[in-house]
Amino acid sequence: MSSNFEHDHEENEDYGKQFRPDREIYVVKKDGSKELFNVQKVISAVGKSAYRALTKFTKEEKEQICQYVVDKVNELEVDEVPIPIMHNIVESALEQVKPIVAKSYRDYRNYKQDFVRMLDDVYKKSQSIMYIGDKENANTDSALVSTKRSLIFNQLNKELYQKFFLTTEEIQACRDGYIYVHDMSARRDTMNCCLFDVQNVLTGGFEMGNIWYNEPKTLDVAFDVIGDIVLSAASQQYGGFTVPSVDLILEPYAEKSYNRALAKYERLGVAADVAEREALADVKKEFEQGFQGWEYKFNTVASSRGDYPFITVTAGTGTGKFAQMATITMLEVRRKGQGKKDHKKPVLFPKIVFLYDENLHGPGKPLEDVFEAGVECSAKTMYPDWLSLTGKGYVASMYKQYGKIVSPMGCRAFLSPWYERGGMHPADDKDQPVFVGRFNIGAVSLHLPMILAKARKESRDFYEVLDYYLELIRQLHIRTYAYLGEMRASTNPLAYCEGGFLGGHLKLTDKIKPLLKSATASFGITALNELQELYNGKSLVEDGAFAVEVLEHINQKISEYKEEDGNLYAIYGTPAENLCGLQVKQFRKKYGIIEGVSDREYVSNSFHCHVTEDITPIQKQDLENRFWDLSNGGKIQYVKYPIDYNTEAIKTLIHRAMDMGFYEGVNLSLAYCDDCGHQELEMDVCPVCGSHNLT
């Protein structure tokens, strides 16, 4: 890496000649050996510390450091200085000149001691992974050798992140449980989630793995090439990987396949109407095989990270015949499932999101049959999820005003608008927002019930304590932007050099800093239900006013931060997953067991009502609607349908959710017998063959 930082501490100026002590002084090293003191070695060491802190010294600052160190050494009035004392002098000089480098120097100075502890922790974790496995990520199969190696590396990477990136205050906040830094094992290396611009990469051809790929000329080749792009690019990040509007991406390649097939049948002398019918059938077959290939590839071929990337595709707005065919066929393939004959089950990836436009998919509208195919698929497989483009709220406002679709990244993250000319704000009425090709750099979540408990225990104002942790997360995000900006485009060529990301036509040696201006950073929120319970003993079903007030306060602070820092911060309704159990343990350790707060084994996800609440789907939609526009950086509304494959009821509730502007998830209790293939909503034992081998 040939950065300005490196050039700075490789310059030829010898400060040892300019700044000398008043006598010969030796530095006594840890092994007892002695070396003549030379302040040039101090400059070399602190230069490296500055490089690790993403800064550099001016000539004047270096001279200040040299003068300080030489003066202190002279004051000692000894001929030999032990290395620990020399370290203290240098550290003190750095505190005077540039405190951020003092921390970097201090952290690195103690690395040997810390590495012993870190490697011991990694060893213990590796033994657990090797012989027991790991359940932290549902997208990894810890039985595989490649995954075990990845998990062990991740543990080391997590330790390095805590040691060399987080401040003492941040580490303490994480250990206590007031904040949670997501994906510590990967944040030093790369990005979080994205809306990858596959179409931009494909157009005109691209380079991958030092081999040139021509743009596909048929649909079947397009499926293969897109599959390779997705797996390669998704391996270079750690969050959800979304291919937005996949129906529109595939449409031109379907047209090419159709024209080729039609020409073939015409050469054979087939009647025009028969040739058209057969050509369409061929394209349909290519769609079926292509989507089936994706389902096998994305669910069985692990990435180089050792996991199965969280791949999402969005579709539904294409009005052309091949775009409609793409969406309907994708839904049919998902509904039928994969596996042995009579034992087929729906797969997980790619997650499908249906882009719902009332003017296209509503009753009697041109794409109503596409909507019907989606409902039928949801009733069988719980997917697609449904994103409203024409209801209320932020996503719909972008679509209605600009015709721009804000597809979700991964399971629920959404990008804030970034305008072509104005950036964070539109330059004028004609400025357009851009979403495709952008990404998120990471999320840090607040544990709100713990923050309230801390404020009460310490007799402090709740919002004062909350603002402290918001500021902590803010500073962490600022350093993350700066740190990632120093990375080179060669770390993810498809994204940074071949056009997968907005502005991604850099040279391999270029820094990626220019691409970060449109990237978001997330402030996550969890356990709003438990926050309300702790506040006044009432759940979100019974009250919720305080939870709304808190979320409004967070929104206000984040808006201020955005304007002051020029960064696209977003508020994210955290999908707590394993975190929901960890947070209960952290709360109990500090504040004990409190009814409705920490008496269960898990807290609620984001602003969701607790899963134990006895409420109807409509009540749940109405209750969670209060928080919808306060969590625009990430959210989803789930409803569990207690009805036996009643597609009309599901359709009614989806329509209602779309009117409300929701991103709606369909939850059903579905069970499959792995022995005979029987399926029904809920079963502990298969009623057909008596098997307990159920999925």
List PLM regions with ranges.
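Short, hydrophobic beta-strand segments
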Residues: I25, Y68-E75, I311-T314, E530-E533, ...
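Structural motif
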Residues: F37, V81, L515-T520, L694
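Amphipathic, well-packed alpha-helical segments that form the structural scaffold of globular domains
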Residues: G47, V70, R474, I478, ...
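Charged, amphipathic alpha-helical regulatory modules used
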Residues: S2-I129
